[in-house]
Amino acid sequence: MAVVTMRELLDAGVHFGHQTRRWNPKMRRFIFTDRNGIYIIDLQQTLTYIDEAYEFVKETVAHGGTILYVGTKKQAQESVKNEAERVGMPYVNHRWLGGMLTNFQTVSKRLHRMKELQAMDAAENGYEGRTKKEVLMLTRERTKLERVLGGIADMTKTPSAMWVVDTNKEHIAVSEAHKLNIPVVAILDTNCDPDVVNFPVPGNDDAIRSIDVLTKVISHAVIEGKKAREERALAAAKEAAGDANKTEVAAKVEATEEVAAEAEAK
């Protein structure tokens, strides 16, 4: 069964690219035609590339990997947040801080500070002894940190791969990923550079419905990857238990043989 159908892509407007005057010539091979000054993306190719991206994400998660969802443009914010939270993956949907990956140690300190402020706010007497002005400043600091770092609060190390909506807008994130050899899976609109993406998904990165349907595909791959991981872990546990039982039986047989040998000697 297909991960997503041609009809679903058409209904979501995934095939609509940018105006013909706003394009990247490197995207030529992904373009089917142009209509009324708008490039039309070849959805047959999109389906093929979706399958490749899907398998990569699924296998990455199946082997214990983490996928970081990135989409800070207005049209992507809600979908990125909702889908990442639905599958338990980290996300950035408001602002990409320079060094979020390449200087993760510093970012980790900011995460620690955010959690300190959250604990203070949750405690019954967390603000005891502080003035109203101090409480207001601490609240503002916490809110600001949560807005920018809330989606990666539980991320303890750099991700295994990254899902990106609009590689042009998220060029800093993509650049940092490349420096750390983190594979990038991304929607490629007709004004994007395919050379900066490891697993391209040719499609409309401006329409909310298009972003939503493609991000859901990635989330489905994450879910399948988690299932595969659990199945492998269960199989490994059963195998380990089986080996333990075999060892125990062998030990009992050996002990019985020794007793029999001693009895015969007497």
Curated annotation (Swiss-Prot):
One of its GO terms (biological process) is translation. InterPro entries: Ribosomal_uS2 (IPR001865), Ribosomal_uS2_bac/mit/plastid (IPR005706), Ribosomal_uS2_CS (IPR018130), Ribosomal_uS2_flav_dom_sf (IPR023591). Gene3D superfamilies: Glucose-6-phosphate isomerase like protein, domain 1, Helix hairpin bin. GO terms for molecular function: structural constituent of ribosome. Pfam families: Ribosomal_S2. Keywords: Ribonucleoprotein, Ribosomal protein. GO terms for cellular component: cytosolic small ribosomal subunit. Belongs to the universal ribosomal protein uS2 family. NCBIfam families: rpsB_bact (TIGR01011). This is Small ribosomal subunit protein uS2. The lineage of its organism: Bacteria, Bacillati, Actinomycetota, Actinomycetes, Mycobacteriales. The gene is rpsB.
